[in-house]
């Protein structure tokens, strides 16, 4: 069976179907950025690619291709071919790509065909697909409506977005960035590269556009940077000019929300629960020890995050919040108590996050289409959907 290659008109279908991809570029190229759904099974490793590149510059294309065939022959060729075959056996819809759709993916395609497996490649390769994804973000920003959920830290914006998934298409930028968007917002998984973040964003927008052509997409208000990654200019500017829904909750509710997310639902809360349910089994003791170690590492991480914003807090307030954090750590270690974390959380909100947020809103001169509690905002959104 002949599988025609994939041109630019077919990239939407390729990405929205979560098509498995084999990226045959060298690992150094792959880690800088890849297409969503890719696995890196290179035809040339980093050293081999460098040698072929040097030969190409000095002696031309024919000599470079000849050197590549000399290096990747015999057992080396069989090993790489077997990796591709094993992956395709598990993922029969696999598509191939290299940087420009040139020799590397073409040779891979031919070797597979010689082995009885016919798979298409992306015409124009990674470069063509990457430009398509960049254009996708720009086109979405020009043509599709957003509803932006804003509100001070701890007001439950992320929870609101999760709760209205059945009514609206939603885009979770923090999940794509693997970061909660604050000084304390790093997640356990490392953040993607900037290119990978943009590519994932584009694929999510493609899926939203395909499934919800006319519905506004609900997104949480973010600054341009979320951890180390940042939103493309066109999309960020579109967010800033979109309708705003302002979620407003009292301070104690917000502190409780933050406490739940950053203490109870983390190794700190898990370790407290494990120590409370002490059992005489050695395995239980080992689990408690592991959780306690993770909890202490998290306290250290919070202390480092606090240090990073010390200048913005000011010396006196930094020392005050730092001491409250240390007291909470001691209470956890000595008394298995975690409620005291609310003290430093509450001060951090009042001293740092609220002034930062309100200052941003004043500069932007935000005029929300709705302002109210999280539940009131949910009710408003559902009513708006019914009357659309």
Swiss-Prot record:
InterPro entries: P-loop_NTPase (IPR027417), Rhodanese-like_dom (IPR001763), Rhodanese-like_dom_sf (IPR036873), SelU (IPR017582). It is an enzyme of class 2 (transferase). It catalyses: 5-methylaminomethyl-2-thiouridine(34) in tRNA + selenophosphate + (2E)-geranyl diphosphate + H2O + H(+) = 5-methylaminomethyl-2-selenouridine(34) in tRNA + (2E)-thiogeraniol + phosphate + diphosphate; 5-methylaminomethyl-2-thiouridine(34) in tRNA + (2E)-geranyl diphosphate = 5-methylaminomethyl-S-(2E)-geranyl-thiouridine(34) in tRNA + diphosphate; 5-methylaminomethyl-S-(2E)-geranyl-thiouridine(34) in tRNA + selenophosphate + H(+) = 5-methylaminomethyl-2-(Se-phospho)selenouridine(34) in tRNA + (2E)-thiogeraniol; 5-methylaminomethyl-2-(Se-phospho)selenouridine(34) in tRNA + H2O = 5-methylaminomethyl-2-selenouridine(34) in tRNA + phosphate. GO terms for molecular function: transferase activity, transferring alkyl or aryl (other than methyl) groups; tRNA 2-selenouridine synthase activity. Keywords: Selenium, Transferase. Residues 15-138 form the Rhodanese domain. GO terms for biological process: tRNA wobble uridine modification. The active site is at 98 (s-selanylcysteine intermediate). Signal peptide: none annotated. Belongs to the SelU family. Involved in the post-transcriptional modification of the uridine at the wobble position (U34) of tRNA(Lys), tRNA(Glu) and tRNA(Gln). Catalyzes the conversion of 2-thiouridine (S2U-RNA) to 2-selenouridine (Se2U-RNA). Acts in a two-step process involving geranylation of 2-thiouridine (S2U) to S-geranyl-2-thiouridine (geS2U) and subsequent selenation of the latter derivative to 2-selenouridine (Se2U) in the tRNA chain. Monomer. PANTHER family: TRNA 2-SELENOURIDINE SYNTHASE. This is tRNA 2-selenouridine synthase. The gene is selU.
């Amino acid at each position: 069976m002949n599988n025609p290659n994939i041109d630019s008109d077919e990239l939407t279908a390729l990405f929205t179907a979560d098509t498995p991809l084999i990226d045959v570029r060298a690992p150094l190229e792959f880690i800088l950025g890849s297409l969503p759904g890719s696995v890196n099974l290179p035809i040339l490793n980093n050293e081999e690619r460098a040698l072929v590149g040097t030969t190409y510059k000095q002696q031309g294309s024919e000599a470079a291709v000849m050197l590549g065939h000399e290096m990747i022959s015999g057992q080396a060729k069989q090993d790489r071919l077997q990796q591709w075959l094993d992956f395709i056996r598990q993922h029969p819809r696999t598509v191939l790509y290299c940087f420009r759709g040139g020799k590397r993916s073409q040779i891979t395609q031919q070797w597979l065909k010689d082995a009885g497996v016919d798979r298409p490649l992306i015409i124009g390769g990674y470069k063509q697909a990457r430009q398509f994804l960049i254009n996708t973000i720009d086109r979405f920003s020009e043509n599709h409506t957003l509803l932006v959920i804003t509100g001070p830290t701890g007001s439950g914006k992320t929870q609101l977005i999760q709760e209205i998934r059945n009514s609206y298409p939603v885009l979770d930028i923090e999940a794509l960035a693997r970061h909660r968007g604050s000084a304390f917002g790093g997640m356990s998984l490392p953040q993607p590269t900037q290119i990978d973040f943009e590519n994932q964003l584009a694929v999510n927008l493609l899926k939203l556009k395909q499934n919800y052509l006319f519905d506004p997409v609900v997104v949480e208000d973010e600054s341009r940077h979320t951890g180390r990654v940042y939103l493309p200019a066109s999309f960020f500017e579109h967010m800033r000019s979109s309708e705003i829904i302002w979620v407003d909750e009292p301070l104690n509710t917000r502190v409780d929300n933050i406490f739940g997310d950053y203490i109870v639902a983390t190794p700190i809360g898990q370790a407290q629960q494990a120590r409370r349910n002490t059992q005489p089994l050695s395995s239980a003791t080992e689990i408690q020890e592991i959780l306690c170690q993770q909890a202490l590492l998290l306290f250290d991480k919070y202390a480092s995050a606090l240090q990073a914003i010390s200048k913005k807090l000011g010396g006196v307030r930094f020392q005050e919040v730092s001491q409250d954090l240390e007291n909470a750590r001691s209470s956890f270690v000595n008394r298995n108590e975690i409620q005291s974390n609310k003290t430093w959380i509450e001060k951090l909100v009042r001293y740092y996050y609220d002034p930062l947020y309100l200052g941003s809103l004043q500069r932007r001169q935000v005029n929300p289409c709705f302002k109210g509690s999280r539940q009131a905002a949910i009710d408003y959104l559902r009513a708006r959907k019914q009357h659309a």
